[in-house]
Amino acid sequence: MRLPPRDHLRGAVALINSRSEQLNSPYSKVLTHAVQNEVVSLDVCQTLETSLTLMSQIRTSIILGHPMVPTPKVWPLSAPTSQTAGEQLVMATSGLLNLRLEWEALSSKSPQYTTEGEILQLLSKAQDLDTRLVTWSHTVPSNWKPIPAAIIPQSVRAAGLFDGRCDCYTDVWVATTWNYYRDSRIVIQNIILSCLHMLPNHNTTATAASSTITIKSLATDICACVPFVLGSQMESVQMNPYKVEYPEAEGRRVTHAHQQTAPLVGGFFLLGYMESLCTSSFGCLKDEQIGWVKGQMQRILQIYTFGMRVVGR
C-alpha cells in the first residue's frame, strides 16, 4: 500500500481546521475519519510521535471549534526513546476502527433484527482486542512504565490533583502513548458493556462489573497523568517555559526537553482524551471526577487561548 506523505496529512488536518463552522458536518466527519485511518497506516511504517501529533490536532480542533494554536513548522523533540513499544501499540489497536464501525452498525439496527449470535460475536471481538492491549501494557520497557511522583511542588498541587494521584513518565510522548492505550481500552470496554446490556438472558453481572472497574481505573490513570504533563502551568508561557514547575519521581528528574515541550504541546495532547472521559465513560465515573476533568479542560483552554473566553464552555 502506498502511504501518503506527511505533508499531505498535515494539509488534510489544516483543511479540517479551516472548516470551523462545518466541523460537525457529515463531510468533515468523513474527512476526519479518513485522515485518522491514514495516520494509523503512516504510523505503522514510520513513528508514533508524528501520528499522535496529527491525531491530537484533529481531536482538539473539533473540541474547540477552531484551530487552537498555530502549528509549528518543527515540533520540539524530547530525549530519544525506543519507538518499538509505540509501534506495537498501534499494531495492537489496528482493529479498533473496524470494531467501532461494527458496533455502530449493530446498535443502529432495530432490536427485532438483531440476533444474539451477532451480539456475542461482537462481544468476543471486543474482548479479544482488549486482551491484546493488556498484553501490550505488560510488555513495554521498564522506562516506559509510569512511576508515582515522589516530589510534588505545592504549585502543582494547587493547579490540581485528582484523588492525590500523580504519575511521572519518561517524557510527554510516552505519557501520550499511555493515554492512547487507556482511551482505546475505554472505548472497547464501553462496547463490551453495551453488548452485555443487550444480553438480558445471560448472567453478565460479573463481566459488566469488571468492565466498569476497568473504565474507572483507566480514567483515573489519565487524570494522574495531568500533573506531569501540565505541571503548575495556568497560562501561556511561550516566552519563558522554565517558570513552570513539575513533579518528579525517584530516578525521573525533570528534563530540559520536558520543560521545553510540555508547555507547548502538553495540554494539546491531553484535551481530546479528557473530553472522551466526559462523553464516553458510560456513566461509570462519579460526578466529582467528571467535574475535576472539566475543570482541567477549562484550564487547558485558558492556557492555549491566552485567557480568551471560549464559546460554549
Positions of PLM-derived features:
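Central/C-terminal regulatory/activation regions of fungal transcription factors
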Residues: 2-200, 204-232
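Intrinsically disordered, low-complexity regulatory regions with latent secondary structure
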Residues: 40, 72, 135, 168, ...
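Glycine-centered flexibility motif
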Residues: 65, 238, 304-307
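Phenylalanine-focused residue identity feature
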Residues: 97, 113, 162, 228, ...
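Carbohydrate-binding/catalytic loop surfaces
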Residues: 152-171, 238-260
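C-terminal region detector
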Residues: 185, 272-275
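Short glycine-rich, low-complexity/disordered patches
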Residues: 232-240, 312
